[in-house]
Regions:
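A Lys-centered signature of the CheY-like receiver
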Residues: 8, 105
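Short amphipathic alpha-helix used as the core "switch/output" element in two-component signaling
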Residues: 42, 64-75
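Active-site residues of response regulator receiver
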Residues: 55, 83
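Receiver (REC) domain active-site loop signature in two-component systems and cognate sites
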Residues: 58
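Alpha4 helix (beta4-alpha4-beta5 surface) of REC/receiver domains from two-component response regulators
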Residues: 65, 86-101
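C-terminal output helix
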Residues: 107-116
Length: 120
């Protein structure tokens, strides 16, 4: 399994990677990174990840813009948000565009694992 973590915060990418490393569900997964949606598009094309975990608000291209671009290209991998943005409207928008989950920051490895259980 290959997982792409997309976040403009290097520290947050490290936190997500650390949480993933504790989960049996994704044991042995290769974890790759991108700093925003624009970079993620290239990484997705080159690496074909099985799962994308994206922040919502990022420079260049937001997480929802990334998901929309993937949908338009017909190549959206399993996609979920790990973000501090968590309004009911954002949950609905994420769901409408095919995101499998939205985990709010701060999160625990257990809450991430529960979200992944419904997506993988």
């Amino acid at each position: 399994m290959k997982i792409l973590v997309v976040d403009d915060s290097k520290a947050m990418r490290a936190i997500v990677k650390r949480a993933l490393s504790t989960l049996d569900r994704v044991a042995g997964a290769t974890i790759i990174e991108a700093v925003d949606g624009k970079e993620a598009l290239g990484v997705i094309e080159a690496e074909s990840p099985d799962l994308v975990l994206s922040d919502w608000n990022m420079p260049e291209m937001t997480g929802i813009e990334l998901l929309q671009a993937l949908n338009e290209a017909g190549s959206a991998p399993t996609f979920g948000f790990v973000t501090s943005e968590s309004t009911p409207e954002m949950h609905e928008l994420a769901k409408t565009h095919g995101a499998r989950f939205l985990v709010s920051k701060p999160f625990t490895p257990e809450s991430l694992d529960q979200a992944l259980a419904g997506a993988l």
